[in-house]
Amino acid sequence: MTTCSICNESEIKYKCPKCSFPYCSLPCWKIHQSQCETVNDNNTTTFKGVKEPLNPPEPSPNVIYVNGRIPSLAEEALPSESLLESIVEDPSIKNLIESNAELLHIMKELVNLDREEEGSVPLKTLDAIQQQRLHNPSFEKLASMILEKYYAQK
């Protein structure tokens, strides 16, 4: 036997049609009705006394939150100009890109996509890079070479 969540005395006989909260009688339903509300934006119902507000995630040390919502990379997470130059000038990386026409085409598309994006975090570009890493072995090899060089000099 499950007792009513409002009066804690009688057995449950009914459930709220809006949120399925169990109650036993009309007086308990009236008490519950004052605490039950429908949220109109997505037609969901909540019970005021039960749900806790969602807390935002803890910020990562490498992410700066602007207005509490828009992340951008912290300066220390970005590669230095000298590191970028050494990666671009690396003979093995240059050779891999120049010897693979498809890879050269992908790199040009990614550069163009990055130039078109606005904001501090190029989400479309990052998504495109991830897709290429998943579906293109040559691109994965290039990404691995760049990351090895990046972490070797960090």
Curated annotation (Swiss-Prot):
InterPro entries: BCD1, Znf_HIT. GO terms for cellular component: cytosol; nucleus; pre-snoRNP complex. One of its GO terms (molecular function) is zinc ion binding. PROSITE patterns: ZF_HIT. Zn(2+) 2 binds at residues 16, 19, 32, 36. One of its GO terms (biological process) is snoRNA localization. Zn(2+) 1 binds at residues 4, 7, 24, 28. Keywords: Metal-binding, Zinc, Zinc-finger. A zinc finger (HIT-type) spans 4-36. CDD domains: zf-HIT_ZNHIT2-3. The keyword Metal-binding applies. Gene3D superfamilies: 3.30.60.190. Disulfide bonds: none annotated. PANTHER family: BOX C_D SNORNA PROTEIN 1-RELATED, ZINC FINGER HIT DOMAIN-CONTAINING PROTEIN 3. This is Uncharacterized zinc-finger protein C4F10.19c.
